[in-house]
Amino acid sequence: MAEITVGQLAQQTNKEVDALLKQLKSFGIEKSSEKDTLTPTEMKTLLEKINSAKNTATRKKVTSVKLDGKHKINVSVKRKRRVAKKVEQQESTTLEQPQELETMVQEVSQQVDIVKEQDNIEQIVENKEAVKVQEQRQAEIAKPVIKDSGFKITAMPEIKIEEIVAEDDEGLAASDKQAKKKAAKKVFSEAVNTNTKYKREEEEKKSKAKKAGGKGFKKANPRQLSQLAGDLESFDEFGAKKGKLKAPKVKKQEFTKPVENTVRTVEIHEGITVSELAQKMAVKGAEIVKVLFNMGVMATINQSLDQDTAILIVEEMGHKYTLHNENALEEAVTIVDRSSYKKISRAPVVTIMGHVDHGKTSLLDYIRQTRVVAGEAGGITQHIGAYSVKTDKGSITFLDTPGHEAFTSMRARGAKSTDIVILVVAADDGVMPQTEEAIQHAKAARVPIVVAVNKIDKPEADPDKVISELAQRNVIPESWGGDVMFVNVSAKTGEGVADLLEAVLLQSEVLELEAFAEGLAEGVVIESRLEKGRGPVATVLVQNGNLKQGDNILCGTEYGRVRAMHNDLGKKIKAAGPATPVEILGLSGVPAAGDEMVVIENEKKAKELAAQRSQKQKEAKIAQEQSLKLSNMFNNMGKEGEQQVLKIILKGDVQGSVEAIRESLLKLSTDEVKVDIIASGIGAITSSDVTLAVASTAVVIGFNVRADSAAKKLAETDGVEFRYYNIIYDLIDDVKKAMSGLLSPEMKEQIIGIAEVREVYRSSKFGSIAGCMVIEGVVKRTNPIRVLRNNVVIYEGTLESLKRFKDDASEVKKGLECGIGVKNYNDVREGDQIEVFEVAKEL
């Protein structure tokens, strides 16, 4: 703090030098003239003296003021100063100013004399608004209160001696002078109002008694004066009356926090999300995410949790849990009480297994006395067929599974639904890879085996070799002390077939096969497909109960009402008992082969359960895709070259064939080339398949199906390649060649013409003759043909006759009519298409 002289301090505080010297002397600071300087220590002592003792200094000055020459007003100016320590950095103090009181009283007296002049009084009243503005700005500096017919002045401007420094001398003096002037104006304004009010009251009370005490008027009430001062403050700077300002009321939202945490019982189901779990525990999802993070699990509020993790979270947060039984509905619907029904003996379900071309279908064909093999391409069974055969000693239901390794999954499903396995082994070929696979499936399903050693009519047949090879694979014949019956048969001559059937029936007696013939039916789906005009068609093997037309059934994720039933001979039936294969119509979709079939009394529950199964299947598929993406991401890390992908869209005639081909193609994937089947289905190739192929640059493969006209036009425009197959060997071999880069760019098989059947005639010489219109290409007499129904291949063979009117023709071109006779095939119908193709040379 800089040194300051007594004169400078007097000038800044607007005090007389003598008065200031006396005040300094009273504080113990001896100074004789205005030129003496105050040291920082003396200034500090001055501040301490002022702040100590009392914070409130009271001064009172009483003067008399004459009014109208008759009355006097005793003006008592009582002054209080309160020093508040607002901020430590701004320590304030107050200097007593007794000299100011006399000056202020003199000013008030002079102004009261002016009141006598009415014009001046009105002018002063008009100026109250300006005084009011100044008063608001100095609200914390001065708040005058009138008491006992005088004036009580509070909070006169504080003189902050601590801030008196050399640099701020002029500013401090100016602010102090301005504060004193404003306070005096405030006193004067209220005095004027009081005097005016008094005069008005005197005029009204002229007739009343004179006032006592010689004062001439009654003492003013402090409350009334305070109200008067408040009225002066209720006008704004423009003269308008102010409204009363009320502090806004804040609504308090209060609640009582529970002393103890509420323990909840949370029902946990599989796949519960974090948000669902938080909702059940009445907490925020972020809290559960924190708990998971502490457990080392990164999760979001929409992520699904397994039951074990959810249980740990619930226990960690102090709640109880109960596990939700998701199979409650399924158990309530599918479990049938058969305690009141009696069991009866049923026919055995026999599955014929063996290596390809060992004579399985030929053996079954001989048993059924039909020509099944002649209707199948290449002599290979393409999908499971179920047939019921009646013998002299009882009925037998046969399931004919394909022998090719691609149909492993189909054979596995067949083994699950069968009672006895007939293992067909060619006597001239011995045990082959598919033979070993059939043995493994039969043993895994714990199904007894009956070995049929086929083709014993061939000169090179060696049944003993077959027995020894099977014995090495733990299939021991009865003659060697085992439990497996061996029967030598010939599907060509029929030798030993009767002995084989007798062995099967004998084995079934040992098994004591029984089933419930009454009650709601249960079974298994053998095969399914989608037919145009009929919708989803499923081949079902009834295992228990009685399946009737009109029953509500549930097959996997599909449900429906049985609209019609056909047996293995194609005849309509009303009911089917145990061990009976039937073909049913009326399902909502195509079920997967191997799905269980159950009859449900309530159609609503069947629909609900189907939706629940579908949701589970969808969630499982999504989880599997996520895991595959993750594994692919790690597998592809660190590889130098990019893996080539062969994209395929696969369409087939039946569900089982599509699944088997899909598995075979996926097994062909290598580190360099990956087979990716982006879509698969049953039925004809449609325009949507072509659109998908264009978007994904995929090859469209049809197995025993063709593309419809819209798909063909779109494929020609977009340049999509169709490849048709009816032999699975050729399909797999071509895909292998494509993967290795050895596939020839030329088509091995080319369709040269298509004729549409418009009408069917009968001929005594050729049988059924199809009246056709050639709609594409050219139909040649010498080329092989296929018969398509709803774009699905139903027959393959050659033309027996081709006529234009009554004349024989070697070829018929597009737009012309012709008559076509198909060799060894009479089931031609209107709407069928006859496809003519040729085999091109491979380069």
UniProtKB/Swiss-Prot annotation:
Organism this protein belongs to: Francisella tularensis subsp. tularensis (strain WY96-3418)
Ligand binding (GTP): 354-361, 400-404, 454-457
Gene it is expressed from: infB
UniProt subcellular location: Cytoplasm
Protein name: Translation initiation factor IF-2
Function, as annotated: One of the essential components for the initiation of protein synthesis. Protects formylmethionyl-tRNA from spontaneous hydrolysis and promotes its binding to the 30S ribosomal subunits. Also involved in the hydrolysis of GTP during the formation of the 70S ribosomal complex.
Keyword Protein biosynthesis included in the entry's annotation: yes
Chain residue ranges for the region called G5: 490-492
UniProt GO cellular component terms: cytosol
Family per record: Belongs to the TRAFAC class translation factor GTPase superfamily. Classic translation factor GTPase family. IF-2 subfamily.
